[in-house]
């Protein structure tokens, strides 16, 4: 058996097993009769005779469909006999097995109708106790007939029947066979606990699912409480198995993309980055300052791209991370040439002669002493007790003795070098940084370090190049010589590139050349198919000539009868031409007539008059132009008068003479025939 047929059989069995518990069966049940006591005090038979030595009694039971009047016939619902149960009067005990079983069982295999007829007969046998019904000489003691209705149920219905000789006490009921339920024992249900279903049967035959199962046929397990309906499933109760892409005890957590570092997902295989992270796998730190706090001593950290940052140091600190503490005297706090002495937590200024104060800021000189240097202007104050110098640009100090150094505030970030340019300053940045203060990080790939079309990747330790086929080296600067391009397979100055394998190459052709090796020029147009075009044109011309010849032949054939008629007309005498009948006085009758015409010796002057559909009644009385009265004796007859003509079949006594003309313009081709009885003249269109 093929795998397909085995699968089909498996599904067929599954369908049969699922539908089997609910099918409507024919029914199956048992009519039970319990005999309790029989009394025959006198030991008499039904015929009035006594039993000798006593009535050895057995019973015959016949169960059949309901009959208003019980009649003899087959026991349609079943029958049963008992062994000898006693003599004359006796009590019948219940017995569940062996001979003499009580209650008596009458099984049936149909839907219980609810009504019945029951015949109970008591018999006396002189023969065998175990099979008395087969013994000869059995005699009837008594019989009772019960007709009525009985519903299926476990309760017994008791009754007692008495007559003049006997008394019988009994009870009966109808119960369904195993696996059959309902009011008529027609509902089949078999409890089961397997992969086809997990249920028990209710008293009415309906299914009652076992704990943990649900569905019409109790074949669907109840999953763990809270298990996601779409993302989880179960094959047995209290279980939660996750579908691909989901995880967690309740299958409500999606699985992110493999390699996702700092991201989450809302659908499987997604990587949505957390705040401060970027990249395909959320592994690029966009908020390095927050995650790592690289700046020390209270300095301010500023993010400048993936893994990039800048530390702005507080006064007294320096370094890339502001990790270096400056000397207290580094800011030159002492003025007017005072010397600074650095202590652990402070400093001290040693003032030169003529100055005093914490920073030597006070002078004992006056403007008269010309204390201002480098062109500074002195201004008296405090009533001559002190002075102030107004310094020119690029100089500072209480006496304008210091040249302004614009780099003292360390304005250049990321280790940049500050250059003092007089009234301004510039920052010389380290490689990888730019900006006025070297605050911007430059991608290592911005300089396009990869040669020959290599792809640059900006990594933490520097750029990395992915080289195209045919090149290698850190910057893709080395051409691989052991490849298909080494032999120079490309022509006409084309550039050769190694393919994906060493034996493959691709030629990049210059303008004007094509082909796998650029060996074909494209300047010349392809040759025109003159032979094919010429042959096609010749066939068309030949066909046109044949058509023209056929048309000409047809025209010649059509014109030949007209030429013959014109020739005959030209041969007529003037008298014959003048006596032609105009076409306006002829009428076509659409009747076929056959005339016998005598055309004399000149047969060309008369056309055939046979089979022409003409009205021969308009010619009489016509007098042609130039004709003489009396030449035609009957010419004075009315045009409307109809004179019958003799047809060929009438065998006229005369022969008809006709004059024919094919004139095209004023006259039609006609034959003029005399209307006289003997001459039979008539005009007809030819």
UniProtKB/Swiss-Prot annotation:
Residues passing through the membrane, by range: 531-551
The organism of origin for this protein: Rattus norvegicus
Major localization class: membrane
Cysteines engaged in disulfide bonds, as pairs: 51-55, 62-75, 176-185, 189-201, 209-218, 223-234, 227-240, 242-251, 254-265, 260-271, 273-282, 289-301, 295-311, 313-322, 329-340, 334-349, 351-360, 367-378, 372-389, 391-400, 407-418, 412-427, 429-438, 445-456, 450-465, 467-476, 485-496, 490-507, 509-518
Domain DSL as annotated: residue spans: 174-218
Keyword field contains Cell membrane: yes
EGF-like domain ranges (all copies): 219-252, 256-283, 285-323, 325-361, 363-401, 403-439, 441-477, 481-519
Signal peptide: 1-27
Taxonomic placement: Eukaryota, Metazoa, Chordata, Craniata, Vertebrata
Residues exposed to the Extracellular side: 28-530
Gene name, Swiss-Prot/TrEMBL: Dll4
Oligomeric and partner information: Interacts with NOTCH4. Interacts (via N-terminal DSL and MNNL domains) with NOTCH1 (via EGF-like domains).
Protein's job: Involved in the Notch signaling pathway as Notch ligand. Activates NOTCH1 and NOTCH4. Involved in angiogenesis; negatively regulates endothelial cell proliferation and migration and angiogenic sprouting. Essential for retinal progenitor proliferation. Required for suppressing rod fates in late retinal progenitors as well as for proper generation of other retinal cell types. During spinal cord neurogenesis, inhibits V2a interneuron fate.
CC per GO annotation: plasma membrane
Protein name (Swiss-Prot/TrEMBL): Delta-like protein 4
Gene Ontology molecular function terms on file: calcium ion binding; Notch binding; receptor ligand activity
Keywords: Cell membrane, Developmental protein, Disulfide bond, EGF-like domain, Glycoprotein, Membrane, Repeat, Signal, Transmembrane, Transmembrane helix
């Amino acid at each position: 058996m093929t795998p397909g047929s085995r699968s089909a059989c498996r599904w067929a069995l599954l369908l049969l097993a699922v539908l089997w518990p609910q099918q409507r069966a024919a029914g199956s049940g048992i009519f039970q009769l319990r005999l309790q006591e029989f009394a025959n005090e006198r030991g008499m038979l039904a015929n009035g005779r006594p039993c000798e030595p006593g009535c050895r009694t057995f019973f015959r039971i016949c169960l059949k469909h309901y009959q208003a009047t019980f009649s003899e016939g087959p026991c349609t619902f079943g029958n049963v006999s008992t062994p000898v149960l006693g003599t004359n009067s006796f009590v019948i005990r219940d017995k569940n097995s062996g001979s003499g079983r009580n209650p008596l069982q009458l099984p049936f295999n149909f839907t219980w109708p609810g009504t019945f007829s029951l015949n109970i007969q008591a018999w006396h046998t002189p023969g065998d106790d175990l099979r008395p019904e087969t013994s000869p000489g059995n005699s009837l003691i008594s019989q009772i007939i019960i007709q009525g209705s009985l519903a299926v149920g476990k309760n017994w219905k008791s009754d007692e029947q008495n007559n003049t000789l006997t008394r019988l006490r009994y009870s009966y009921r109808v119960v369904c066979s195993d696996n059959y339920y309902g009011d008529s024992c027609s509902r089949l249900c078999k409890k089961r606990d397997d992969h086809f279903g997990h249920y028990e049967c209710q008293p009415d035959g309906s299914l009652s699912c076992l704990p943990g199962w649900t569905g019409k046929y109790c074949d669907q397990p109840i999953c763990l409480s809270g298990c996601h309906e779409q993302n989880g499933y179960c094959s047995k109760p209290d279980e939660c198995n996750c579908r691909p892409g989901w995880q967690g005890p309740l299958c409500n957590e999606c699985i992110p993309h493999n390699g996702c570092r700092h991201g989450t997902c809302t659908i499987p295989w997604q990587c949505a980055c957390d705040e401060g992270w970027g990249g395909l796998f959320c592994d690029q730190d966009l908020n390095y300052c927050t995650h790592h706090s690289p700046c020390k001593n209270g300095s301010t950290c500023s993010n400048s791209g993936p893994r990039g940052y800048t530390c702005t140091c507080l006064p007294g600190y320096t370094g890339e991370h502001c990790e270096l503490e400056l000397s207290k005297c580094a800011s030159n706090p002492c003025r007017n040439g005072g010397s600074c002495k650095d202590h652990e937590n402070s400093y001290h200024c040693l003032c030169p002669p003529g100055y005093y104060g914490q920073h030597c800021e006070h002078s004992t000189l006056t403007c008269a002493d010309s204390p201002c240097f480098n062109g500074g202007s002195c201004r008296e104050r405090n009533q001559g007790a002190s002075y102030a110098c107004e310094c020119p640009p690029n100089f500072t100090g209480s006496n304008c003795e210091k040249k302004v150094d614009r780099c003292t505030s360390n304005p250049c970030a990321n280790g940049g070098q500050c250059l003092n340019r007089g009234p301004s300053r510039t920052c010389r940045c380290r490689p990888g940084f730019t900006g006025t203060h070297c605050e911007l990080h430059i991608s290592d790939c911005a300089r396009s370090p990869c040669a020959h079309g290599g792809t640059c990747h900006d990594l933490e330790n520097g750029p990395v190049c992915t080289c195209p086929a045919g090149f290698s080296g850190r910057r893709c600067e080395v051409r691989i010589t052991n490849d298909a391009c080494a032999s120079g397979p490309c022509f006409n100055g084309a550039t050769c590139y190694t393919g994906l394998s060493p034996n493959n190459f691709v030629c990049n052709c210059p303008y004007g050349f094509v082909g796998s090796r650029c060996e074909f020029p494209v300047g010349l147009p392809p040759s025109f198919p003159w032979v094919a075009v010429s042959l096609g044109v010749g066939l068309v011309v030949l066909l046109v000539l044949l058509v023209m010849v056929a048309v000409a032949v047809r025209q010649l054939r059509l014109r030949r009868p007209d030429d013959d008629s014109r020739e005959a007309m030209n041969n007529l005498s003037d008298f014959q031409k003048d006596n032609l009948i105009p076409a306006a006085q002829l009428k076509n009758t659409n009747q076929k007539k056959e005339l016998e015409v005598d055309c004399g010796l000149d047969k060309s002057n008369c056309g055939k008059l046979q089979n022409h559909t003409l009205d021969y009644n308009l010619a009489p009385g016509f007098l042609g132009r130039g004709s003489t009265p009396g030449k035609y004796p009957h010419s004075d007859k009315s045009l409307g008068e109809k004179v019958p003509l003799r047809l060929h079949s009438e065998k006229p006594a005369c022969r008809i003479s006709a004059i024919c003309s094919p004139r095209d313009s004023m006259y039609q081709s006609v034959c003029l025939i005399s209307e006289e009885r003997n001459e039979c003249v008539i005009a007809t269109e030819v």
